[in-house]
């Protein structure tokens, strides 16, 4: 096991917001006033940049990091530990490589919201697939972010063989604005042209967890296509006004790179109409029809929240908490569909942050409540293989969830935020 201590101070900030949250002179105790916003935000990109190496790019949002200082004579600092273990896909009991390192981000009295970029290289070989277990720890807060990543080196056309940037910055989620210019770099000069398939379909929102309605399988059926030229393993492309592009570099399958167009507010809510749509999970059918057919979406959504909140102050708090969950869902669960529309997004919005999440290569299980407690319930999501996204999961639906669903929805409709930590 190699262990490195790396102290890095970052002076370039992506965000301009200034905050005095998460500052301590003494070691902080864990206190969750709003668990919905307690998640460490880490975006990851894997790029097979050569035949023998894979670069792991990390982008850490400092919003939920804890900054502290031993006394008033020194700067506030956040300390993060990064640990990984690399396995061969065919033998996960044998460790190929492992590494731990720490870095410290220093700040003055006014802690600015920013993105912290990091990267490290792995020794990998063409023709092999790997499993990377990644643990990122906020040392001051004593909380972990865990992620298991599959490294695909058998398929030279998989998305990990391409790196996307815009304005010379790495894109961690391949989401862009309408008409934005995107640069794509290939790791090898394998082709001179690529096929761009265009998809402009508006995908529906998730059905309730107990629904027995048939869910249409996602079919590969582009609305249109065009050819783009590649020069020196590099090309630029202008994003569509809506929908997404799927770029294929061969004719034998649909593997390739997907680029998405979302509005400028993303991962937040763009307008009052989308606020109405995202509130479908706690609205009755009649309320939803009334709100979606009105000519004044703002008045309709304000009236709805006031009706369940009972007062302006309470309505504002409910609205804030609900749409914060919508935003977090977009950050965490977006695939070819916005995160709030997905199965995981729906569960997160209604039930809040799980007590525990268990992950493996086949999917995830979310636990709400303490283990071995009869009132504890679980949601199981299965990972779906599709050419557009590796973040597509489908809930295993069951009538068992009906009581829990209506209980949680009733919490919201009674003017209370449902959260397993606060029940």
Spans of model-derived segments:
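Early exported N-terminus immediately downstream of N-terminal targeting peptides
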Residues: 268-319
């Amino acid at each position: 096991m190699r262990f490195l201590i790396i102290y890095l101070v970052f002076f370039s900030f992506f965000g301009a917001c200034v905050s005095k949250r998460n500052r301590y002179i003494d070691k902080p105790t864990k206190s969750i006033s709003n668990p919905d916003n307690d998640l460490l935000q880490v975006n990851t990109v894997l790029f097979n940049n050569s035949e023998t190496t894979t670069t792991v790019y990390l982008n850490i949002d400092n919003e939920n990091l804890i900054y502290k200082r031993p006394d008033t004579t020194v700067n506030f600092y956040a300390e993060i530990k990064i640990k990984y273990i690399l396995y061969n896909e065919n033998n996960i009991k044998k460790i190929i490589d492992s590494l731990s390192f720490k870095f410290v981000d220093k700040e003055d009295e006014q802690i600015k919201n920013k993105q912290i970029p990091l990267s490290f290289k792995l020794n990998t070989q063409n023709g092999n697939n790997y499993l990377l277990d990644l643990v990122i720890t906020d040392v001051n807060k004593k909380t972990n972010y865990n992620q298991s990543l599959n490294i695909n080196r058998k398929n030279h056309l998989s998305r990990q063989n391409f790196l996307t940037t815009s304005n010379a910055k790495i894109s961690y989620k391949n989401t862009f604005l309408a008409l934005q210019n995107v640069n794509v770099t290939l790791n090898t000069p394998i082709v001179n042209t690529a096929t761009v398939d265009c998809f402009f379909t508006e995908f529906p929102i998730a059905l309730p967890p107990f629904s027995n309605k048939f869910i249409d399988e996602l079919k590969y059926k582009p609305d249109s296509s065009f050819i783009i030229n590649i020069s020196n393993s590099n090309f630029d492309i202008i994003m569509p006004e809506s929908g997404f592009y799927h770029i294929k570099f061969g004719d034998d399958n649909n593997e390739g790179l997907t680029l998405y167009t979302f509005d400028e507010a993303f991962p937040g809510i763009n307008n009052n109409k989308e606020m109405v749509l995202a509130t479908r999970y706690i609205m009755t059918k009649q309320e939803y029809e009334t709100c979606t057919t009105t000519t004044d979406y703002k008045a309709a959504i304000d009236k709805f929240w006031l009706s369940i909140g009972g007062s302006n102050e309470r309505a504002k708090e409910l609205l804030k908490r609900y749409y914060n969950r919508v935003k977090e869902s977009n950050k965490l669960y977006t695939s070819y569909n916005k995160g709030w529309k997905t199965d995981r997004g729906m569960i997160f919005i209604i039930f809040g942050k799980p007590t525990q999440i268990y992950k493996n290569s086949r999917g995830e299980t979310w636990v709400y409540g303490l283990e071995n407690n009869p009132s504890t319930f679980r949601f199981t999501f299965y990972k779906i293989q599709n050419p557009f996204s590796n973040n597509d999961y489908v809930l295993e639906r069951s009538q068992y969830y009906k009581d829990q669903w209506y209980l949680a929805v009733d919490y919201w409709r009674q003017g209370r935020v449902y959260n397993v930590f606060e029940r």
